[in-house]
Amino acid sequence: MASVKSSSSSSSSSFISLLLLILLVIVLQSQVIECQPQQSCTASLTGLNVCAPFLVPGSPTASTECCNAVQSINHDCMCNTMRIAAQIPAQCNLPPLSCSAN
């Protein structure tokens, strides 16, 4: 029975990670990002696709390509995108995400 719960918890974590990645892509495509220039911000964030495997619980450490993509993003661009993404649950009439460190 414990293995079923563990599997369910792992599946939930994987689903949440995948959902967050999808939400980030949606934000990139549908929201105006307050970055100058916008095209540069969008292109940089699109480059984060190489980080997708790292978002799944139990995955290995981030690849060199992922780290390089994150390093190349403008600070304001990343912060504005995270701020916009955090608003999505409320805009969809969902409760805010509450994530633990575990």
Curated annotation (Swiss-Prot):
Keywords: Disulfide bond, Secreted, Signal. It comes from Solanum lycopersicum. Gene3D superfamilies: Plant lipid-transfer and hydrophobic proteins. The keyword Disulfide bond applies. Stamen- and tapetum-specific. InterPro entries: Bifun_inhib/LTP/seed_sf, Bifunc_inhib/LTP/seed_store. GO terms for cellular component: extracellular region. Belongs to the A9/FIL1 family. Residues 1-30 form the signal peptide. Its main location: secreted. This is Protein 108. It is found in: Secreted. Disulfide bonds join C41-C77, C51-C66, C67-C92, C79-C99. SUPFAM superfamilies: Bifunctional inhibitor/lipid-transfer protein/seed storage 2S albumin. The keyword Disulfide bond applies.
